[in-house]
């Protein structure tokens, strides 16, 4: 079976065509600047990268161009649209309606739309991508895979906020969590790599990228996670503040004469390590600045690592123990300094890091010493493959 995996943003569209038998990506690509001038970058598994500058006025045109690239006689990987057996769509927010992936029908589309208030930047774009694919491939089964679904196993004590219960009743204000597809894939892979029984395991997954979140996965189920109603809660991130005193919003708004929307924009797009360091949202730039003596850059890195470690500690309490701590996503997979800084806070647990193994980038391996009481691991995430597997199970 060939599965087309679509991740649709407001002005971009990532895709992979995956052979579900070999679990290999036959082609990967990205449509950028949709609605502006348009650019499609396409690469087949054994071919050169192709960059096509072409107008992409909307997502339907972008999907048509993706199909054309996949079928191109020079760099394509299929000869007919009929070779695409199913399409898997990443959907950011499923609210409480979706605890699992589902085959898309009109009822599902309506339910996704009802969650738009919870993810106004993402869900509408996800729906546009789904509808564009449906118009081009009306007879191909489509599956929605939700970022929030994996975390629907959290108990109430983990997802309820200390606010009037009526807001949960009326508006479903609660912790939802995100990056669920990644947390699910990585936690399962971790139990295999560590030789653990998934039904008797306690794994903490640190998904550290420009967006970052941590989850506590007990016996294969998410029991807590750092992101909340929105992806703004939790860890300090590239541009997001993460946890803070809510009164700061009112305080800054009054001091700076800003509207609520302006303050929220600052917390989402101008805070995190970017705001703290004054350098960049890219940890490579911040580390370079820190090495040159920039104190704000040093502080941003130290606070980031401390916050990660503090969450790890709290999730050990949530699960009454831990077997493995796993680093994944761009930063977690590639930044040895961040992994070492976080792990240094965990030495009281008997954590012992192998410096040579930790120096490797982007490889799946155990980076703790054999005598470490908790396994520390690096597992590259593969959300597209995880979505493909969900699709195969349902169709």
Swiss-Prot record:
It holds the Pfam family Acetate_kinase. The record marks 179, 240 as: Transition state stabilizer. InterPro entries: Ac/propionate_kinase (IPR004372), Aliphatic_acid_kin_short-chain (IPR000890), Aliphatic_acid_kinase_CS (IPR023865), ATPase_NBD (IPR043129). Its main location: cytoplasm. Mg(2+) binds at residues 7, 383. It is found in: Cytoplasm. Substrate binds at residue 90. One of its GO terms (cellular component) is cytoplasm. Keywords: ATP-binding, Cytoplasm, Kinase, Magnesium, Metal-binding, Nucleotide-binding, Transferase. It catalyses: acetate + ATP = acetyl phosphate + ADP. Belongs to the acetokinase family. Catalyzes the formation of acetyl phosphate from acetate and ATP. Can also catalyze the reverse reaction. This is Acetate kinase. The gene is ackA.
């Amino acid at each position: 079976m060939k599965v087309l995996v679509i991740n649709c943003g407001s002005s971009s569209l990532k895709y992979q065509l995956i052979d579900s038998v070999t679990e290999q990506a036959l082609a990967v690509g990205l449509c950028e600047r949709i609605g502006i001038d348009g650019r499609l970058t396409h690469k087949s598994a054994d071919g050169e990268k192709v960059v096509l500058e072409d107008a992409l006025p909307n997502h339907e045109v972008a999907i048509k161009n993706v199909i054309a690239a996949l079928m191109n006689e020079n760099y394509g990987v299929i000869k007919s649209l009929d070779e695409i057996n199913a399409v898997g769509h990443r959907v950011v927010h499923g609210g409480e309606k979706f605890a699992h992936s589902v085959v898309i029908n009109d009822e599902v589309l309506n339910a996704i739309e009802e969650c738009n208030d919870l993810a106004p930047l993402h869900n509408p774009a996800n729906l546009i991508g789904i509808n564009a694919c449906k118009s081009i491939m009306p007879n191909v089964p489509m599956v929605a895979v939700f970022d929030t679904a994996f975390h629907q196993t959290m108990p109430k004590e983990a997802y309820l906020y200390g606010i009037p219960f009526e807001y949960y009743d009326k508006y479903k204000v609660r912790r939802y969590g995100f990056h669920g597809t990644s947390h699910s894939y990585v936690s399962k892979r971790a139990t295999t790599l560590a030789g653990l029984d998934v039904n008797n395991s306690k794994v903490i997954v640190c998904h550290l990228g420009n967006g970052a979140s941590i989850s506590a996965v007990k016996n294969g189920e998410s029991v807590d996670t750092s992101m909340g109603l929105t992806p703004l809660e939790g860890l300090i991130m590239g541009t997001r503040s993460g946890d803070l005193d809510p009164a700061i919003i009112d305080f800054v708004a009054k001091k700076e004469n800003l509207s609520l929307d302006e303050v929220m924009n600052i917390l989402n797009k101008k805070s995190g390590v970017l705001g703290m360091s004054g350098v960049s949202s890219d940890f490579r730039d911040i580390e370079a600045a820190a090495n040159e003596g920039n104190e704000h850059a040093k502080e941003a890195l130290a606070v980031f690592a401390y916050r990660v470690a503090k969450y790890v500690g709290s999730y050990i309490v949530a699960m009454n123990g831990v077997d493995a701590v796993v680093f994944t996503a761009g930063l977690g997979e590639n930044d040895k300094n961040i992994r070492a800084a976080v792990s240094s806070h965990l030495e009281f647990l008997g954590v012992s890091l192998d410096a040579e193994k930790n120096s490797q980038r982007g490889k799946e391996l155990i980076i703790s010493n054999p005598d470490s009481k908790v396994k520390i691991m690096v597992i590259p995430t593969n959300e597209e493959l995880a979505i493909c597997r969900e699709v195969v199970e349902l169709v």
